């Protein structure tokens, strides 16, 4: 799959560039007209399940043949802020012509008009140590603190624990990195003083070590198995915090680096190592060194 959607202003083609929550291009609509839909969802964060429906956004009549793509050829007439001086005259055109046109062009996905029947929860928790990320440093920190009796919360944004260990060839303690991570997670889950959460994103860090975490509980399950709340919002007060969320590869700047077929090397490696997906057979690798 190369063409996922279209960009906001010029309707340029967009494909998958990353393999996680940092995805800027592959934005889709989840659901259909007969159910509750969720706009502006990153395709790289959606786990496949039976009955999943997703569609491209910001394109008409289809993503392959998008009328709005003409904006890309007329880009010289649409510089930044062009609307502040273009739609000034005549004044009588504003409410009936200009404003409806601008409002129709604005936005990205389509907000659902249906009532959200899903259940949502919130929870308050306290811990001695909150750790974001389950890579080698996060797991080592959680294990050491838990062994010393500390109350630990380990949060991992993705569905699988291990972080960089999932794509590397390193060994830890005479074990393969992935096996070491699996063993540590198994031990942590058995400890009564440890809370281990995957699909949980810590997105807010406030005064006095108050952190907010969003846990996706049943987003990855088919409708027939969605008995639990859809999401849970955690308010966590921590004595200490370890941020071990890893790094994000910085894309290099060159012409048309926003189009389908351009993907970060770290993402290509993760798709191959974790999901068994080959992103291409004849790649051109561009590095900065």
Language model: regions and residue ranges:
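Residues forming the flavin
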Residues: 1-289
